[in-house]
């Protein structure tokens, strides 16, 4: 039996509708629309009087029709008078009343046409729904980058030894599941890597997949944040479906906080798209077994804002911190990034590592890349310490501005004293810190100058060190006031004031370093509302004033050193560590 496709069936139906409509029109024309003799109303009355009319059809229209005694049809004007019907009946004429003599045919034709339109509309609607469904499925299909047989290994990652050991254990889980099943141990379903940006979270996840010899499916948390309802959850389901089809693999979700934030919205609950997406992720992670060889890894810079359900056992079982590298790790990272570069043998990587406190692995890579660019510009034989030194200040403060013709002499003087104040305050208050460079050359990052203050590696910040950091931040503005007067202080201290306020606010609100507030955390008690607390505002203001006055007394006593540094800056524009130390040595010997 011949079977028609849906498209062919619709075409046949359309042709049938047209044919039926044509037949209906033909019938209508043939039987109901014969030629009628059109006569005047006067002639109609005369024929009525003469008894020549057999039948008259009365309707509501402007015309009336009828049949003569000889069978011929006629049509004439309808006078619409009340006495017309009575007059016709008195003359023995048969009267038929109808609303429309052709209504049956017209109704049939109308029904057929409407039916045809409805059929076409249904077809188009279904076709559109199918197309919409396909588009939805297409949008629900998450795109991910894959990696197999990558050259990245744990040996290519320097620092974070503890994190690497954790990752190596997961590799062993994937390669030797029997070893752990013997003891009833289950492979963690999920691992969250957290830490500062640029510390190598993605690199570690890639290395894990590479070492285990499994596929690496990488997506971003923002890929699941969509305008259309249900798309995020659909993408989660599709991702896990594809992962299961591939067998053993590593799913890596970067910036998971985009979909995994805490769902507590001030007690109001939540049912928006991000909640549905998170629920889909939680469901999928609960729905597969560790024996399937799928590990879900995620990265975030903010572990504290993730939903508790995401961090419970059975979901992301392990949380591994990827911290900023310490001195040895920085040296190892620098060694790694200089392996295939022509480095001058005189370059001391340990010295660079000591200088790059709080640099992440990515920042160290950028440092060496900038140094290589400077060497390439000069077409030098080697990347020298000078190139690395220049790259260091470019990474930290931006490149030096070439055109400085628009800088007024008074602006240079204000900048020189401002930066000299920072340098002297650092040497006096934080002797353990290194002042490696002071300059009054503007940078492309908007700084009029800067004083490079490098602290030592340390695990904690003491109250004393935080107080001294505030004083150093305030010292530039204080010197402006001492030298130029209170009415001539400038906007150059805006970043310094911001930094000092942040440190002092944290001491009072978070770290319990204020006797009046005591050992409480304002953020826990009041949330963001605590930031506007009047009491905190007053305490911050009073303590800032006290520290400002103490620093002012110190700098007034050391004004001769500040002037010496400032005068040298006005001449040389840039002072390095040995030059600054020489100025201080000269005053200490006096």
Swiss-Prot record:
It is found in: Cell membrane. It is a multi-pass membrane protein. The keyword Hydrolase applies. One of its GO terms (molecular function) is ATP-dependent peptidase activity. Keywords: ATP-binding, Cell membrane, Hydrolase, Membrane, Metal-binding, Metalloprotease, Nucleotide-binding, Protease, Transmembrane, Transmembrane helix, Zinc. Its main location: membrane. ATP binds at residues 195-202. Its EC number is 3.4.24.-. The chain crosses the membrane at residues 9-29, 104-124. The active site is at residue 419. It is an enzyme of class 3 (hydrolase). It comes from the Bacteria. Residues 1-8, 125-590 are cytoplasmic. Its cofactor is Zn(2+). In the central section; belongs to the AAA ATPase family. PANTHER family: ATP-DEPENDENT ZINC METALLOPROTEASE YME1L1, METALLOPROTEASE M41 FTSH. This is ATP-dependent zinc metalloprotease FtsH 1. It comes from Alkaliphilus metalliredigens (strain QYMF). The gene is ftsH1.
């Amino acid at each position: 039996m011949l079977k028609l496709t849906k498209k062919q069936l619709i075409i046949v139906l359309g042709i049938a509708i047209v044919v039926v409509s044509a037949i209906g029109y033909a019938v209508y024309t043939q039987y109901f629309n014969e030629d009628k003799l059109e006569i005047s109303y006067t002639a109609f009355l005369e024929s009525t009087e003469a008894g020549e009319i057999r039948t008259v059809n009365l309707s509501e229209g402007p015309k009336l029709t009828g049949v003569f005694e000889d069978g011929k049809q006629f049509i004439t004007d309808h006078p619409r008078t009340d006495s017309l019907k009575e007059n016709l009946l008195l003359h023995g004429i048969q009267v038929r009343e109808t609303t429309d003599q052709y209504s049956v045919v017209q109704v049939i034709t109308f029904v057929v046409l409407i039916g045809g339109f409805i059929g076409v509309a249904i077809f188009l609607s279904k076709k559109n729904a199918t197309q919409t469904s396909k588009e939805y499925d297409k949008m629900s299909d998450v795109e991910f980058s894959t990696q197999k047989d990558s050259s990245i290994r744990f040996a290519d990652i320097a620092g974070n030894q503890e994190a690497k050991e954790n990752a190596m254990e997961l590799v062993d889980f994937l390669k030797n599941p029997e070893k752990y099943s013997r003891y009833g141990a289950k492979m963690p379903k999920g691992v969250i890597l957290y830490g500062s940006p640029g510390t190598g979270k993605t690199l570690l996840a890639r290395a894990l997949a590479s070492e285990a010899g499994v596929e690496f499916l990488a997506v971003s948390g923002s890929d699941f944040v969509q305008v259309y309802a249900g798309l995020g959850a659909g993408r989660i389901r599709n991702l896990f479906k594809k992962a299961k089809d591939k067998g053993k693999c590593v799913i890596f979700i970067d910036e998971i906080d985009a979909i995994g934030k805490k769902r507590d919205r001030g007690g109001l609950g939540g049912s928006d798209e991000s909640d549905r997406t998170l629920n889909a992720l939680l469901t999928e992670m609960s729905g597969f077994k560790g024996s399937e060889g799928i590990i879900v890894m995620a990265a975030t810079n903010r572990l504290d804002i993730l939903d508790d359900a995401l961090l419970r056992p059975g979901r992301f079982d392990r949380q591994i911190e990827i911290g900023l590298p310490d001195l040895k790790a920085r040296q190892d990272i620098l060694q790694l990034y200089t392996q295939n570069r022509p480095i001058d043998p005189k370059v001391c990587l340990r010295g660079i590592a000591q200088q790059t406190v709080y640099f992440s692995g990515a920042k160290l890579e950028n440092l060496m890349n900038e140094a290589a660019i400077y060497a390439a510009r000069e077409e030098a034989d080697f990347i020298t310490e000078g190139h690395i030194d220049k790259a260091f200040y470019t990474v930290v403060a931006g490149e030096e501005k070439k055109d400085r013709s628009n800088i007024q002499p008074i602006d240079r003087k204000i900048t020189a004293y401002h930066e000299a104040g920072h340098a002297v305050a650092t040497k006096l208050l934080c002797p353990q810190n290194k002042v490696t460079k002071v300059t009054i050359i503007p940078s492309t990052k908007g700084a009029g100058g800067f004083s490079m203050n490098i602290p030592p590696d340390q695990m904690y910040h003491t109250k004393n060190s935080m107080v001294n950091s505030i004083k150093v931040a305030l010292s530039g503005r204080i010197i402006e006031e001492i030298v130029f007067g209170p009415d001539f202080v400038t906007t150059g201290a805006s970043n310094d004031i911001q930094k000092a306020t942040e440190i002092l606010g944290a001491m009072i609100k978070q770290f319990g370093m204020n006797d009046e507030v005591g050992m409480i955390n304002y953020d826990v008690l009041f949330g963001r509302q605590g930031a506007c607390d009047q009491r905190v505002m007053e305490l911050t203001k009073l303590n800032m004033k006290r520290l400002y006055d103490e620093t002012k007394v110190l700098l007034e006593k050391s004004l001769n050193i500040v002037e010496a540094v400032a005068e040298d800056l006005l001449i040389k524009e840039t002072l390095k560590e040995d030059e600054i130390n020489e100025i201080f040595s000269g005053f200490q010997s006096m």
